[in-house]
Structures are given as C-alpha cells and as structure tokens.
Amino acid sequence: TEALGPAAYIGRCRVVPLRNTGAALSPMNAFQILQGLETLGLRMERHCENAEKLAGYLQQHKKVKWVNYAALPDSPYYTNCKNITNSKASGILSFGVLGGIEACTRFIDSLEMILRLVNIGDAKSLACHPASTTHRQLNDKELISAGVSDDLIRISVGIEHIDDIIADVSQALDKT
C-alpha cells in the first residue's frame, strides 16, 4: 500500500472477490447467453431489415431534416457498407427532426411503443435524444465535434413488426 496508496485498496476490492468466487457465470446466465448467441443471426437480419425500412420511411417524411443510415444509397458510408457488410448496416440509425431540441423532446415524449432508453442492441426498439442524455455534459463546441446536434434522434431499431415501429414513429412525429 505504500507504493500504490489508495489504488492498492481499489485493486484488492476487485481481485479478492474474483479470487474467492471465480469469474464463472451461473448456469442460468450461461444458458441465456447461449440462447442469445444461437438466435443472433436471425435477430440481426430483422434488425437490419427493419432499420432500412424505417430509414426509407424517414427520408420521405416532411418533418425529418436528414437521415443517417449507411445502407441508404445517398449515405457517405454506402460503398463501405455494401463492400464490408453486404449492405446490412445494423439496426441503428439517426435522423434530424425539424424544429430542433423542442421538437425532439416532443418526439421522444410522444413515443408509445418505442422505449426511451440510451442503450443499444436490444430486441425492442429504443430511442434517445443524445444532446440531452448521453452527451448532455458537453458544451456546444464539444457537441459539434462529437457530431451531436440538437435535432438528432438515435433509434436502435428492434425486431418488432415494421408496421408497428413506423406507426409509433409517425404518430410521434405528428406531435412535433
């Protein structure tokens, strides 16, 4: 402890419980991870399919300023997406809502099926407004540097039926 000071205690707090209990998963957790891995391919197909359809819908919406999704032909990342992932760009997209932060707040608050959470990769659709959640501690210059604008909404598109996802996004956009 003399050489490391308080860091020695922190290290002990991390190492001793692992030494005593091991870093082994419980049988139930191991089973659930295995189940998730076995269906990952199927779920990713649905995530990508739904995200591409939602991105196409958003491109046509009058209250949407821009859409960022690599599988769209007008994306600057389209060629890379096509070459690397066979045009499957994942289940995450972002878009800009006309009306700025106030419209984004109304959009997020109006979602009914899509959950308002900042994590990604769930089977359920999730949405967030990064400027007021994950990046809220940044100043304006840092937000710009991070590519986060006041009008940006990020959606992790789930595996629900695409008609349900679009209906929820549509009714929320109508309230902006």
Regions found by a protein language model. Name each.
Residues 43, 109-110, 124-176:
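PLP-dependent enzyme catalytic core of the Aspartate aminotransferase-like
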Residues 1-92, 96-124:
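Active-site C-terminal subdomain of aminotransferase-like
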